[in-house]
Swiss-Prot record:
InterPro entries named among the record's database cross-references: Papain-like_cys_pep_sf (IPR038765), Peptidase_C19 (IPR050164), Peptidase_C19_UCH (IPR001394), USP_CS (IPR018200), USP_dom (IPR028889)
Root EC class: hydrolase
Primary role: Required for maintaining multiple types of adult stem cells, including male and female germline, epithelial follicle cell and intestinal stem cells. May function as a transcriptional repressor by continually deubiquiting histone H2B at the promoters of genes critical for cellular differentiation, thereby preventing histone H3 'Lys-4' trimethylation (H3K4). Controls selective autophagy activation by ubiquitinated proteins.
Protein name (record): Ubiquitin carboxyl-terminal hydrolase 36
Annotated stretches, region: Disordered: 115-152, 523-572, 594-892, 972-1007, 1068-1091
Keywords associated with the record: Hydrolase, Nucleus, Phosphoprotein, Protease, Thiol protease, Ubl conjugation pathway
Record GO biological process: germ-line stem cell population maintenance; heterochromatin formation; negative regulation of antimicrobial peptide production; negative regulation of innate immune response; negative regulation of macroautophagy; negative regulation of peptidoglycan recognition protein signaling pathway; positive regulation of proteasomal protein catabolic process; protein deubiquitination
CDD domains in alphabetical order: Peptidase_C19E
């Protein structure tokens, strides 16, 4: 509203008052601000204006709409005044008379500074990053509301804070203890923690000049800064424990509700103590009450402990972001859902959702749902952290929180273009611990660091050194971390900006081990969350614990030094990036252990490459292996590392490996092992860890060379189009068992064709034949009637033997005595499909095999077998004959009496379901009779033919026939009553309901307990006919009501009650039910008459 309208209407009144005041000569009295009564000077200017004030206020002001206030009103006012050119003051004072803060910028001298740190042109002073260059903006711009405002005045520059013990000129001692004056452990521990903060201690020592000229103590008041400085000096100069009387005698002045001798909270005392020191520092300034909040936050305590949080509230409707800044001096971390300090920081700075429709958006102008997130806009020099261990009810959360002596808060800093690249590293300097179970009781101690870097425990007057491991395992309550000055990249730059005044976040450099050196420029790095060793699905870049996802350039020659090789291949090409959730891939990533010196765990995942489209993937362990050069391996080999032959050339085609294992290995890894490097087998191929599908996806080569890695063969080439598919080992066994009979019929013809088609002993389905035994001739294959040895499958649940349920075993085993026990057999090593180990694939009948050769069991993925060598069964298989007929027959039988029928692998009923019970018992006894004392079967094979029970030779006649009879009776008893079997299995027996029904609704009534108690009471057949002790019927009814499950314990055999009980017993013994006994008056009267 234009004020000139009202002024113009009252011009005459004001002019008359001025003339009268000047004429009388009392103008000075009218200009003074002293309060005078109306009767002293009625002719004063003040009295004239007050008298006409009512008239001025009652004057009607008419409003007019103008298009522009600047042109309509201000231009008219300018014509009535003379504009005098202002002169810039040379002392740098602003309009309020306060000294302007130039923040160390000499170019800003002589400028009037506004409220937000701007000059007259509206340009921020912080926009001059270089002191020697002043980039002027002719147009100027207003303050950015999304940036932290600048204070008009800085009471204590941030650059004057000295960080670290080395910044001081004096020699710092460990410090003496403090005497407990009576429940003052909270005070002693807090003071010790503050005195061992280098920044605060250096500032207190620098206040020596203030202590000499301090006039607060002379006036009878209290200066807490002087008291803290004197107490610190006493702990440094005194060898014995000191008494901090300067602090606890003035406890009422620090906090009004604190009482000496009463237990208090250490964090509460800390906050009141810091606030009292800030007030004492502000009292040094004459107009400290008129200072705004931003200026009050520039005290030395605010510069040391103070920081700013950036709060971003994002509207979920219009995505409007509201940014505010909040000053803090400590961070209160919630540890209820955290186990470490890093997790607590993650939860504090994570994005949280506000209450639904509880935030009024500035853009939508309505209440909407929003999210809120904190960021570090300006990190403090000393970070104070309080763990929320106490609740409002006084209970304490005593969980252990793990923390480190150094923490990095760079990822929580607010990102800005002018951010510094130096990391935000803090180191632990002191802490306060609490021993106790609640807030109302316990003991406080302190831990502080010294100039030498060691830590000491301060328990009141006791001071003792403590190891860093013990420090990290303490039950911390308050922790003080100080900014590490050694982590600054440039001391001059750190000094200029006050050690991260902007606290921005830039790219964090990744530490590379010294063993890797390359003259080429480093590839582009991925800035973001880093993966742990192993990564996704076993990917690892071999850089130790610091795993960074990197992107490879398209062409980069390889460089090798100290046994660590960098990748030089082209980047991985893929049309789509897929994370397969197959069981084999999950097991591979779960148990893949990282190895040292550049040896990584292998991951065999299929890669579908596309030349037209390029997609960058993280560097994996397979990509670091060169295809053209041999990687130099260290001489030391771990058990989980494959032994590579350094002298082999990977460019030459490899011949089949025919070196057998000298000693049978017993592995503790299941068959589907996550790592193929468990067995220490000398391998000549250094590129054996390449993916099996690399060559199949590329151009097909005519050579069919194969390389075996720890018993697993890998195909580098293929002759047919359909032979390159991987077949799972378990599916291969299942389908080979189903088609076993069909393969035996065409054995002779297909065997000859197989020898001609495979010159390099490489089968098209991925099975690789091994060295044959001497007893086998190439011209004459072994008899197809030789039963195969049971295949062993090792899984996570244990070892399983595969048995077949075909009817040809009984016929084929008749002439088994004429056959040689140890025959040559083709070792079939499957090429595992890591995308899906249980995926369906081609059966074994698709490829020509040698059906005359026996199938060798797949144990631990190893397919190595020599002549007359016992099988390594991992402790679960007896080293008997190769056919294993006894164990095979025992495993085919099911436990009928204990559980449901066990089906065979192909889903058919076992032999026990089809054969007579007598024949099974005979075969079982015959099998036990053929075993020697060591538990291994003899050379005489037990075949599966139908043997009459009379033709079996038993060790002892009476014992064997009794065993048959007992087994037959047991089987009849099992099939007789199904309910009894259910009782044997531990299930609850169902109560039979006969003539009587259970009609008792009493809670907790148990008919079984009542029946058992009845038998126990009358086990002697009843006692003598004792008379009734209680003749009162009403009392007897109450007694029976209280003792519901008790009967007449003293009635004779001839009493009616006893006869009634015996009848109930006979009824229950016959399987009938019963109801609860209802006492009647007629029965009791009859019993009393008989007595």
């Amino acid at each position: 509203m234009p004020v000139s309208v009202a002024v113009c209407e009252t011009t005459n009144v004001v002019n008359a008052a001025l003339r009268e005041s000047l004429g009388v000569g009392i103008g000075s009295g009218g200009a003074s601000s002293d309060d005078k009564s109306a009767g002293e000077d009625t002719n004063s200017l003040q009295n004239h204006i007050v008298a006409n004030a009512k008239r001025i206020l009652m004057t009607k002001i008419e409003y007019e709409e103008v298009p522009n206030y600047q042109e309509a009103v201000l231009e008219n006012l300018k014509s009535k005044y003379i504009v005098i050119k202002p002169t810039n003051p040379t002392n740098g004072c602003n309009l309020n008379g306060n000294t302007a803060n130039t923040f160390g910028n000499k170019n800003n001298a002589g400028k009037i500074v506004g409220a937000n740190g701007h000059d007259n042109n509206g340009r921020k002073l912080s926009d001059h990053p270089n002191q020697n260059h002043n980039h002027a903006n002719p147009n100027g711009h207003h303050a950015n509301p999304n940036e932290l405002p600048k204070p008009k005045r800085v009471l204590y520059p941030r650059e004057n804070i000295r960080i670290g013990w080395k910044q001081s000129e004096r020699k710092w001692q460990v410090g003496s203890g403090m005497i407990n004056a009576g429940n003052t452990c909270y005070l002693n521990s807090t003071l010790q923690a503050l005195f061992h903060i280098p920044a605060l201690a250096n500032w207190l020592v620098s206040e020596q000049a203030h202590m000499e000229n301090c006039n607060v103590s002379e006036s009878g008041s209290f200066c807490i800064i002087c008291a803290m400085a004197k107490t610190l000096q006493a702990t440094q100069t005194t060898q014995s424990a000191v008494r901090p009387f300067l602090i606890y005698t003035k406890l009422k002045q620090i906090c009004k509700h604190m009482i000496v001798g009463r237990q208090e909270d250490a964090h509460e005392f800390l906050r009141f103590l810091v606030e009292a020191m800030e007030r004492a520092y502000l009292m040094r300034f004459r107009n400290y009450k008129e200072l705004d909040q931003l200026v009050k936050e520039t005290t030395p305590l605010g510069q040391i402990f103070g920081g700013y949080l950036r709060s971003e509230v994002r509207c979920l409707s219009c995505n409007h972001v509201s940014i505010t800044f909040q000053h803090f001096q400590d961070l209160l971390l919630d540890i209820r859902k955290s186990d470490s300090l890093e997790e607590a920081f993650e939860g504090y700075f994570s994005r949280e959702k506000l209450e639904d429709f509880g935030y009024k958006c500035e853009g939508c102008k309505k209440k909407v749902s929003a999210t809120k997130q904190f960021r570090l806009e300006r990190a403090p020099i000393t970070l104070c952290i309080q763990l929320k261990r106490f609740s409002m009810m006084g209970n304490k959360l005593t969980k252990q929180i793990t923390f480190k002596p150094r923490i990095d808060l760079s990822k929580f800093a607010a990102r800005s273009p002018a951010a510094s690249v130096q990391p935000l590293i803090y180191r632990l300097v002191s802490m306060v611990t609490h021993l106790g179970v609640s807030q109302h009781c316990g003991h406080y101690t302190a831990i502080g660091s010294t100039e030498a870097g060691s830590y000491y425990n301060f328990d009141d007057s006791y001071v003792r050194p403590i190891a860093i491991q013990s420090v990290c395992n303490t039950n911390a309550y308050i922790m003080f971390y100080e900014l590490d000055p050694l982590q600054t990249s440039s001391p001059a730059a750190a000094r200029a900006n006050g050690l991260r005044l902007t606290n921005g976040h830039g790219p964090v450099p990744v530490a590379v081990p010294a063993t890797v050196s390359s003259p080429l420029p480093s590839p582009a790095k991925f800035i973001g969350p880093q993966l742990p060793p192993g990564g996704i699905n076993g990917y690892s870049n071999g850089h130790g614990p610091k795993t960074t996802i990197q992107f490879k350039p398209q062409h980069q020659p390889s460089h090798q030094q100290n046994g660590v090789q960098q990748s030089a291949k082209s980047p991985l090409l893929s049309t789509h990036v897929k994370v397969e959730a197959a069981a084999g891939a999950a097991a591979l990533a779960a148990s893949a252990a990282p190895t040292a010196n550049g040896n990584k765990s292998s991951s065999n995942h299929s890669n579908h490459k596309s030349v037209n489209q390029q997609h960058y993937l993280p560097i994996s362990s397979e990509d670091e292996d060169s295809e053209d050069e041999v990687k130099a391996r260290p001489t030391v080999q771990l058990p989980s590392m494959p032994k590579m032959d350094d002298c082999m050339d990977s460019g030459k085609p490899k011949s089949p490996v025919k070196t057998p294992v000298k000693t049978p290995l017993k592995s503790l890894v299941p068959y589907e092992s996550a790592s193929e490097e468990e067995e220490v087998v000398p391998l000549p191929n250094p590129n054996a860890r390449k993916r099996s599908s690399d060559s199949s996806d590329s151009e097909h080569e005519p050579t069919t060379s194969s390389v075996q890695l720890n018993g697993h063969s890998k195909t580098n080439g293929s002759l047919s189009n359909g032979s390159s598919k991987s077949t799972d080992a378990i599916d291969e066994i299942f389908k080979s068992l189903k088609g076993y009979q069909a393969k035996k019929k065409s054995a002779d013809s297909e065997d000859d064709d197989d020898d001609e088609d495979e010159p390099n002993n490489q089968l098209t389905n991925g099975w690789h034949p091994q060295k044959q035994s001497q007893s086998q001739s190439r011209s004459g294959p072994p008899s197809p009637k030789t039963p195969p040895s049971p295949a062993v499958i090792k899984s996570k649940t244990g070892i399983w033997k595969v048995t077949r349920d075909d009817g040809d075993d009984d016929e084929d085993d008749d002439d088994d005595d004429d056959e040689v026990v140890e025959e040559a057999r083709a070792v079939r090593t499957p090429v595992k499909n890591h995308r899906n180990p249980f995926a369906s694939s081609k059966t074994a009948t698709d490829s020509p095999t040698t059906p005359g050769a026996k199938r060798q069991k797949l144990l631990n993925g190893s397919a190595i077998k020599t002549q007359q060598q016992p099988r390594a069964g991992n402790g679960y298989q007896s080293e008997a004959t190769a056919n294993g007929g006894t164990v095979n027959e025992l495993l085919k039988q099911s436990h009928r009496g204990y559980s449901s029928s066990v089906l065979s692998w192909n889903g058919k009923p076992a032999e026990l379901e089809k054969e007579p019970f007598v024949l099974v018992c005979a075969k079982r006894i015959a099998g036990h009779g053929s075993l020697d004392g060591s538990g291994s079967g003899s050379n005489t094979d037990i075949i599966d033919t139908e043997i009459p029970a009379a033709a079996v030779n038993f060790p002892s006649g009476s014992c064997s026939f009794s065993l048959l009879a007992d087994a037959r009776d047991q089987r009849q008893r099992d099939l007789a009553d199904d309910e009894e079997n259910e009782m044997d299995r531990g299930r609850q027996r169902k109560v039979k309901s006969g003539s009587a029904k259970i009609s008792n609704s009493t809670p907790g009534y148990n008919p079984f307990m009542e029946f058992e108690n009845q038998k126990r009471w009358h086990k002697n057949g009843g006692g003598g006919g004792f008379p009734r002790f209680y003749q009162n019927q009403n009392f007897r009814q109450g007694f029976q009501q209280r003792n519901k499950f008790k009967f007449n314990r003293f009635g004779g055999p001839g009493s009616a009650k006893f006869q009634q009980q015996r009848a109930l017993q006979r009824h229950l013994a016959a399987g009938g039910g019963f109801t609860r006994r209802q006492p009647t008056h007629s029965a009791q009267q009859q019993q009393q008459q008989q007595s």
